[in-house]
Curated annotation (Swiss-Prot):
Reactions catalysed, as given in the entry: acetylcholine + H2O = choline + acetate + H(+)
Location of the active site: 216, 346, 468
Gene that specifies this protein: ace-1
Organism of provenance: Caenorhabditis elegans
Official protein name in the record: Acetylcholinesterase 1
GO biological process, one term: regulation of locomotion
EC number: 3.1.1.7
Length: 620
């Protein structure tokens, strides 16, 4: 409820009167009336607590709802960010530092921000969009400049909510006990969702139109909420950008999560414990007593390979009942409206961190010819692919054949692009496709986009293309902030299209349909399992050479990752000498045009009898 009592906020040149709001538990708070970067008014609330601080004996536990307060809360200051590491790899380069937390780091970090267009009016019944940030489950905060919700809120007349959740070991340590149940970051998100469902009507929000949207690990989080029966009552639609619960880095088994705890225990010099029959009580006691900075400084000790984040959601039997692939296959998820998509060059950002010998920082912004030959390309690929692929020559050869550039001459840019597509498909695009396809097959309405525009204000080198995460700038309306950025007119129009599609989806479940019943000029078709139509999101001048509506995207490559390669790994044991003979023959045929690698190999296998052994299998 609102109270007629007014609070006056004194700023250097303004005095703004703000109504006091009482939450449904009676807690009073007030925000501030501000202008968007486009000059339109809104009311902003920052730092509203939705949980008790997870400190002391609450560290690693599920969050507890915030107890009511009686003194009016001044919700005009950005909240703390959750404890996390900082990216210093490229020094003070803005392209990397823009993703670092920009407020004080603290374990006391469970707060949310609310943006309301104009003045707060409980009678408005506006659609609500709840943002979940990404960051690999090890970083991220709701207060980043790129997540500033003012422009999206006022331009599309929606309410925007952005919550913090615990990351890294603080949010995802799994010890199979109430003191560290795992998925604490997911429980944080769910508690924030419950807060929204309970209170957003007081801000003018429509409880029947709550849409979750997130990017990367935030998108994986949103899709995990689609899988969890715990979350289903508290949202209605979902948007996933460049991430999915089926991404190989998004969820891990319990035994892996438990092993990580042992490795961290040893790295922190708490003791020397074996992975066989470890004493988890001692491990948990060490972590509970440890300084937060000590935990943060050692959090990466359990990492094994590229794309392996140290602390992520786990199939705990509580929040998550089964692995994501099983849920999708059996239809055990919330069938609703889903908007999903990915970017053209998803993995290049991560490759540069993982391969410093190939992409040295000293030459990063001046060179483009980092990979000049096949030998160096294969070396880089072997440093990036997961172990279960590398341990079998046949599966490695299959991946190399799928992605090795075929057109001659092969340029350094071709080698980089092939590596990027290989890892981008595996870690991002194909998992988003998998989620979209399953949602469609089980009766949900799905819309798919593919972002292909490299922004004029992009600070990363041109050879990196359309990077992971950089659709966010357009969705939150950054190009419209002309006082700070110098985007082109076409890019401002693209940003308007992004915002309109996203807001329409939140309002009506259809990105084409405006709230007044009219439709957008460009028709975005529903995604289906046959034609797999998607909207190519780019500037208008690109369309003559590029189709507005595509099919896939990356459907052939994703069939390789999601169908062919898993079947190959499951079916083939140690292939031994027949493979080597076949490989020699393939080398001789290298200059011939082979239209279907799989067909030729299958023909060859008909005349061979594979030697079976007790050695490790490709699919093990």
């Amino acid at each position: 409820m609102r109270n007629s009592l007014l609070f006056f906020i004194f700023l250097p040149s303004t005095i703004l009167a703000v109504d006091l709001i009482h939450l449904h538990d009676g807690s009073p708070l007030f925000g501030e009336e501000v202008l968007s970067q486009t000059g339109k008014p809104l009311t902003r609330f920052q730092g509203i607590p939705f949980a008790e601080p997870p400190v002391g004996n609450l560290r690693f536990k599920k969050p507890k709802p915030k107890q009511p307060w009686r003194i009016p809360l001044n919700a005009t200051t950005p909240p703390n960010s959750c404890i996390q590491s900082e990216d210093t790899y490229f020094g003070d380069f803005y392209g990397s530092t823009m993703w670092n937390a920009n407020t004080k780091l603290s374990e006391d970090c469970l707060y949310l921000n609310v943006y309301v267009p104009g003045k707060v009016d409980p009678n408005k019944k506006l659609a609500v969009m709840v943002w979940v940030y990404g960051g690999g489950f090890w970083s991220g905060t709701a207060t980043l400049d790129v997540y500033d919700g003012r422009i999206l809120t006022v331009e599309e007349n929606v309410i925007l909510v952005a919550m913090n959740y615990r990351v890294s070991i603080f949010g995802f340590l799994y010890m199979n006990r109430p003191e560290a149940p795992g998925n604490m970051g997911m429980w944080d998100q769910l508690l924030a969702m419950k807060w929204v469902h309970k209170n957003i009507d007081l801000f003018g929000g429509d409880l029947s139109r709550i849409t979750l949207f997130g990017e990367s690990a935030g998108a994986a989080s949103v899709s995990i909420h689609m899988l969890s029966p715990k979350s289903a009552p508290y949202f209605h639609r979902a948007i996933i950008q460049s991430g999915s619960a089926t991404s190989p880095w998004a969820i891990e088994p319990r035994d892996v999560a438990l092993a990580r705890a042992v490795i961290l225990y040893n790295a922190m010099k708490c003791g020397n414990m074996s992975l066989i029959n470890p004493d988890y009580d001692r491990i948990l006691d060490c972590f509970q007593r440890a300084d937060a900075d000590a935990l943060r400084e050692n959090e990466w000790a359990p990492v094994r390979e590229f794309g392996d984040f140290p602390w992520v959601p786990v199939v705990d039997g509580d929040f998550l009942l089964e692995n994501a692939q099983t849920s999708l296959k059996q239809g055990n998820f919330k069938k609703t409206q889903l908007l999903a998509g990915s970017n053209r060059d998803e993995s290049i950002y991560f490759l540069t961190y993982q391969l410093p010998d190939i992409f040295p920082v000293a030459d990063f912004f001046t060179k483009t010819d980092f990979i000049k030959d096949r030998q160096l390309w294969i070396k880089g690929v072997k440093d990036l692919l997961p172990r279960q692929i590398l341990k079998c020559q046949l599966t490695l050869a299959a991946v190399l054949h799928e992605y090795e550039p075929q057109d001659l001459p092969v340029t350094p840019r071709d080698w980089i692009n092939a590596m990027d597509k290989m890892l981008g498909d595996y870690h991002f695009t194909c998992s988003v496709n998998e989620m979209a396809l399953a949602h469609t097959k089980h009766g949900g309405d799905t819309y798919y986009y593919y972002f292909t525009h490299r922004a004029s204000q992009q600070t990363w080198p041109e050879w990196m293309g359309v990077l992971h995460g950089y659709e966010i700038n357009f969705i939150f309306g950054e190009p419209l902030n002309q006082k700070r950025f110098n985007y082109t007119d076409e890019e401002r129009e693209l940003s308007n299209r992004f915002m309109r599609y996203w807001a329409n989806f939140a309002k009506t479940g259809d990105p084409n349909k405006n709230e007044d019943g009219s439709f957008t000029q460009d028709v975005w078709p529903k995604y289906n399992s046959v034609s797999m139509e998607y909207m190519n999101m780019t500037v208008e001048s690109s369309y003559p050479s590029m189709k507005r509506i595509g099919h896939g995207p990356r459907r052939k490559e994703c069939a390789f990752w999601k169908a062919y390669l898993p079947n190959l790994m499951a079916a083939v044991a140690d292939v031994g000498d027949p493979y080597l003979v076949w490989k020699q023959q393939m080398d001789k045929w290298q200059n011939e045009y082979i239209t279907d690698w799989q067909y030729h190999f299958e023909q060859y296998k008909r005349y061979q009898t594979y030697r079976q052994s007790d050695s490790e299998t490709c699919g093990g």
